[in-house]
């Protein structure tokens, strides 16, 4: 009996130690409000080192004005690169217009990339407009457009992007069917990989409970596939995950860049890193720390190189922390309130203004 008691105590102690190593809370940062919009729902954020702060607005509803803006103070905004590029309407080509921009991103060379899935209201791609766009730093005009028309079905939705400046490759998530898109930026060749692989599909058994209830759509559990994506500072590893479960995966980018690998060989190179949080976006800093959200817990966490997870901030204002950008020693965070959209609340729109961008010191 005594031995059994000691064993039980040791088991509880070890469990506590493991839990602590899983999430070490070393004190919280404070959120600093950088931008707010009282009318239009934003998703993406991109901060230029010592420069501009941009946000984007997907065309998810009829309450819509511009796709991409440069912010001016906490409420001001200017359409980017101009009003005309932001003025698309049904029936027009989407190749040189912003149709439904999902993400904006500065690579480490300071080049701005704009990702447009071109699927208004998350429906079908319009005007052959699904594209990744590289902007010219000097003229703020479109330098090159990579159209996804050759490889995407009309029902696809490209979600997020990371660019390897040295190797000239881009990696993107596709969140409808699940998968990764690999783009050779030099010659424009692209391909879809890991399509409907277990690492790009949300775990059907995971209950995505947020605000005290499982998120539902059309009477069924809401499932979001491959979404967040992050590239290690050396460009050797791509980290990614489905949104609506807590698993995290990675794969060596050399395998993604090798078109000679069979689908089966490539899938065998995926590494399952374990359980962490449900997050939308994620991003590495230059030291190799990975920052993610916790949609269910209203917090931002950091994973170090040993995958030790630390809470940086927990705050009720973090209503669906969506996208991330790092500049000037800060982590910038957009909050999009997706769980409060009417399709997840029996047709009732529970979103409240403002939609926000915060930052925390890192």
Language-model-derived ranges and their functions:
Residues 16-19:
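C-terminal motif of bacterial Sec signal peptides marking the signal peptidase cleavage site
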Residues 34-66:
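Beta-strand-rich domains and repeat architectures in extracellular enzymes and scaffolds
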Residues 39-50, 92-111, 115, 151-169, ...:
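Beta-rich, blade/repeat-based domains predominating
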Residues 55-61, 114-117, 172-176, 232, ...:
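Conserved beta-strand positions in repeat-built beta-propeller and related beta-rich domains
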Residues 74-113, 117-121, 125, 144-149:
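Blade-loop segments of beta-propeller domains
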Residues 76-86, 143-147, 191-206, 258-271, ...:
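Beta-propeller fold detector
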Residues 125-168:
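Asp-box/WD-like beta-propeller blade repeats and closely related beta-sheet repeat scaffolds
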Residues 185-189, 251-262, 362:
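Short loop/turn segments immediately following beta-strands, especially the blade-tip
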């Amino acid at each position: 009996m005594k031995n059994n008691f000691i064993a039980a105590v040791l088991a509880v102690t070890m469990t506590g130690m493991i839990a602590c190593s899983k999430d070490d809370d070393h004190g919280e940062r404070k959120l600093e409000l950088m931008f707010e919009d009282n009318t239009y729902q934003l998703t993406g954020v991109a901060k230029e080192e010592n420069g501009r702060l941009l946000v984007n607005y997907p065309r998810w509803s009829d309450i819509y004005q511009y796709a991409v803006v440069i912010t001016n103070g906490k409420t001001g905004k200017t359409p980017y690169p101009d009003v005309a590029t932001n003025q698309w309407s049904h029936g027009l080509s989407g190749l040189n217009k912003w149709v439904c921009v999902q993400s904006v991103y500065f690579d480490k060379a300071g080049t701005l990339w704009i990702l447009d899935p071109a699927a208004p209201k998350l429906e079908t791609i319009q005007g052959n407009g699904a594209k990744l766009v590289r902007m010219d730093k000097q003229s703020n005009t479109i330098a090159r457009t990579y159209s996804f028309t050759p490889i995407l079905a009309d029902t696809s939705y490209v979600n997020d992007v990371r660019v390897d400046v040295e190797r000239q490759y881009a990696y993107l998530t596709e969140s409808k069917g699940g998968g990764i898109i690999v783009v050779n930026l030099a010659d424009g060749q692209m391909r879809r990989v890991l399509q409907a692989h277990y690492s790009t599909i949300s775990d059907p058994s995971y209950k995505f409970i947020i605000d005290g209830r499982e998120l539902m759509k059309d009477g069924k559990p809401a499932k979001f596939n491959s979404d967040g994506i992050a590239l290690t500072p050396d460009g050797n590893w791509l980290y990614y995950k489905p949104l609506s479960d807590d698993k995290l995966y990675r794969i060596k980018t050399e395998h993604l860049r090798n078109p000679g690998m069979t689908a089966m060989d490539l899938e065998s190179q995926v590494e399952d890193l374990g359980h962490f949080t449900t997050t939308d976006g994620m991003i590495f800093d230059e030291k190799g720390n990975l920052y993610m959200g916790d949609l269910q817990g209203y917090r931002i966490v950091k994973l170090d190189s040993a995958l030790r997870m630390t809470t940086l901030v927990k705050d009720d204002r973090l209503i669906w922390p969506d996208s991330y950008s790092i500049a000037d020693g800060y982590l910038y965070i957009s909050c999009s309130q997706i769980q409060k959209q009417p399709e997840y609340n029996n047709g009732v729109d529970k979103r409240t203004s403002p939609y926000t961008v915060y930052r925390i010191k890192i």
